[in-house]
Regions:
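Short Gly/Thr/Asp-enriched flexible loops that form oxyanion-binding sites at enzyme active sites
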Residues: 89-97, 118-121, 250-255
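Bulky hydrophobic/aromatic packing residues
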Residues: 79, 93-95, 105, 164
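Flexible phosphate-sensing "switch/lid" loops adjacent to ATP/NTP-binding sites
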Residues: 1-76, 80, 84-87, 139-159, ...
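Extreme N-terminal, non-catalytic leader segments
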Residues: 95-157
Length: 358
């Protein structure tokens, strides 16, 4: 664990923009989260705001309130939101300067780097704190090109993909990793986004900050490193998906199957979402789940189960979609946030047996 942390949300904690904050509130091995800064939900428990489950993480209106209530500044202040284009908004920049002035190191997952802001860097140097831009790419000489070494990895790979972005793929992947471990399956998770790193996953890379020529190689390197460095070695390696195979604003997922060697897929879907996120004005509709499963099969992977995101649905509506899809597809369909993913463990166990025999 790196230390204690305060998560800054710029008044967006109760929105989908705060998925980094949501992930850290749900669980992280990298930080001990002491609080969230978010004006609209101040005074409440962050877990209760997120999903109704109290986690003992208070929400403060300001950084000043947080430091005063906690008695001392946490070690880190984390940007907990995603912005349009990954830009550092004036509000977030001001909050980072305030956090630095209070004595906190800052952690930023946006595409715009705090370390390249002269005023922010000078302020951090003066206060003796650090700036971590999680999405800042490694030097080209340190990046890896795909070599085929992943083909020698003995643990089957299972990718958690989605029919769109911002569906909860990472959360489902973590839930599944934990459920497998509880059931005695040695499972590891390869992160592919900034939140996965912030949650403390040991192996992975930030996919959208790597030049395209090296994405497959960085994925392979993470998988091979996980296989070689784990003791005992994993029985299953989960791969966190990004975006969706057919999202025109940023298609992703085929790398996990073709370059990562994933022969199994868990497919996350939001039944109430008709169009790709942010593209409704262009009438760019999300393909049906059955059609997506057929495409996944063309890539050479088998969809083991479907997991559902409940956005904009009542409990009754979500259950109805669950029953309908299970009947149409003939595979398990589960609601991770509502019922967990333990029902998928037998399916995963059979997948491991089948792939190990193969």
């Amino acid at each position: 664990m790196d230390g204690t942390a305060l998560i800054v949300c710029d008044d967006l904690f109760a929105t989908d923009n705060a998925k980094t904050a949501h992930g850290l509130v749900r669980g992280t091995e990298r930080y001990r989260v002491l609080g969230v800064v978010d004006g609209p939900t101040a005074g409440r428990d962050a877990g209760e705001v997120l999903d109704g489950k109290r986690r003992g993480i208070p929400v403060f209106a300001t950084i000043r309130d947080a430091v005063g209530s906690l008695g001392a500044p946490p070690d880190f202040c984390v940007v907990g939101v995603a912005t349009s284009g990954g830009r550092l908004t004036p509000g977030l920049r001001a909050l980072m300067l305030e956090a630095i002035d209070a004595g906190m190191s800052v952690v930023n997952g946006l595409h715009e780097f705090l370390s390249e802001d002269a005023e922010v860097s000078a302020s951090a140097a003066r206060r003796g704190v650090t700036i971590r831009d999680v999405r800042k790419p490694a030097p080209r000489r340190e990046l890896h090109f795909w070599s085929g070494e992943v083909l020698s990895v003995g643990a089957p790979r299972l990718a958690v993909l989605g029919t769109d972005c911002a569906l909860g793929k990472r959360t489902t992947a973590r839930f599944l990793r934990d459920a497998c471990r509880e059931a005695g399956i040695r499972a590891e998770l390869i992160f592919t986004g900034q939140t996965g790193w912030m949650q403390g996953a040991r192996w992975g890379f930030i996919l959208d900050s790597v030049p395209n020529d090296f994405v497959s190689g960085e994925l392979e390197h993470a998988i091979v490193s996980c296989w070689k460095e784990s003791d005992p070695r994993p029985e299953l390696i989960l791969l966190e998906g990004q975006s969706a195979l057919r999202n025109p604003s940023g298609p992703c997922g085929s790398e996990l199957i073709l370059s990562g060697g994933a022969k199994g897929v868990i497919l996350q879907h939001a039944p109430a979402r008709a169009c790709f996120e942010g593209l409704a004005a262009l009438d760019l509709e999300i393909p049906s789940v059955a059609d997506e499963i057929a495409l996944i099969a063309m890539y050479g992977a088998r969809t083991l189960a479907v997991t559902l995101n409940s956005e904009h649905l009542s409990a009754e509506q979500l259950s109805a979609h669950q029953r309908r899809l299970a009947g149409e597809l003939g595979i398990p369909v589960v609601r991770p946030l509502e019922e967990g993913v333990e029902a998928l463990v037998p399916v995963v166990r059979e997948f491991i047996r089948a792939e190990t025999r193969a």
